Amino acid sequence: MAALCVLGLSEVNMEMTIEKQKAVADDVLHKLFLIQPYAIVAGGAPRDWLDGKLATDVDVFVDTRHINTAKKERELFAVAGLLRFEKGEGRDWDDIPEHYKKNPNIKRVYNLEIDGVAVQLICVKCPCWDVVEQFPIPICQAWYKNGRIGTTLEYKLCKKVGALVITNHVY
């Protein structure tokens, strides 16, 4: 397994805020822009931020359809200034939560910590925007990009009626 050396860690973990989580998300998306301008933060973090809550982690979805090996993904993330890799092979699927393994669009997941914020780079084999609409629970169909949070119509309907429903059985 590859040894990950995370760049951008702070020595002092200041009190966590939604603004700090968004700043880390903005920084990651900015660093990814040249290699993948369509990367987005999606799922739980934008949903939690809309509800005024801290997110447990920030999931950054990166379209890596054009990249056929984990080594090339790691090299691109290193060029973006997000990772520095030492000798090793790549992520082991045993370390990845089961719900990610069930999603047919996810290729690999890289776990990072940046300035005290847990960040997951989730490599997908489809356009990032497609991932959002395929989330099986509409309350997770939210995304963050360019300082703004967006949601699907299904998300808005679920929030309005206060119901938790499953609308997609892709995984």
Summary of predicted features, one role per range:
Residues 2-171:
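Catalytic cores of the polymerase beta-like nucleotidyltransferase superfamily
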